[in-house]
């Protein structure tokens, strides 16, 4: 029992630290010397990076943040042994990486909105669901020109898609 608790704690800590890597902050600081938290919306995420550096860097930060979201979940799926049938360890990793992205220990607990990291976690939990969610997000965002609208709609449908594709119950609960 102690080993299982320690394993889940290790999953959470590692995922949180990976999630805390402030991708947008690092890129904007390297390119302009600015602290992205002092411009635009104050968020360190891809949308605010787009305001400062343009569309190419928006896509770069989206990709890096999605990879940052996926990595801890993939590691948990490969190496964690606790609650395999329920999908518990990968979901703990997903939650921790989202918390890390939005409340980075490296930025005095400030961060991004966790949209790209969230998509990365869903892609890693179930890549088919992740692709459907990413497609919905892209179409809605392109159509409305609002990242937030695309994000909300995509995330609202994610638990239903996860459920209908027979994913572990913890994955469905995570998306809900």
PLM features: what roles do these ranges have?
Residues 1-11, 73-92, 123-129, 163-174:
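Helix-coil boundary and interhelical linker segments in multi-pass alpha-helical membrane proteins
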Residues 7, 11, 15, 20, ...:
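Alpha-helical transmembrane segments in multi-pass membrane proteins
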Residues 24-27, 100-110, 137-144:
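C-terminal ends of transmembrane helices
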Residues 25-58, 111:
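Cytosolic, membrane-interface loops and tails of multi-pass inner-membrane proteins
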Residues 34-45, 106-119, 146-154:
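Short, non-helical or kinked segments that cap or interrupt transmembrane helices
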Residues 47-50, 58-61, 71-77, 104-108, ...:
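Generic transmembrane alpha-helix signature in multi-pass membrane proteins
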Residues 50-53, 76-80, 96, 114-144, ...:
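Interfacial segments of multi-pass membrane proteins
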Residues 131, 147-155, 166-176:
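Loop-to-transmembrane alpha-helix initiation sites
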């Amino acid at each position: 029992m102690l080993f299982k608790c320690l394993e889940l704690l290790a999953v959470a800590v590692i995922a949180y630290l990976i999630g805390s890597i402030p991708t947008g902050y690092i890129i904007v600081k390297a390119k302009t010397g600015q602290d992205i938290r002092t411009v635009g919306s104050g968020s360190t995420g891809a949308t605010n990076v787009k305001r400062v550096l343009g569309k190419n860097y928006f896509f770069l930060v989206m990709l890096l943040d999605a990879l940052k979201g996926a990595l801890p979940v993939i590691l948990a799926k490969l190496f964690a042994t606790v609650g395999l049938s329920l999908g518990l360890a990968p979901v703990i990793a997903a939650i921790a990486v989202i918390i890390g992205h939005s409340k980075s220990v490296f930025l005095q607990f400030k961060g991004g909105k966790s949209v790209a990291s969230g998509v990365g976690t869903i892609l890693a939990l179930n890549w088919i669901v992740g692709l459907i969610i990413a497609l919905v997000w892209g179409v809605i965002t392109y159509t409305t020109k609002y990242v937030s609208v695309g994000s909300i709609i995509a995330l609202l449908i994610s638990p239903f898609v996860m459920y209908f594709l027979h994913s572990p119950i913890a994955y469905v609960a995570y998306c809900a």
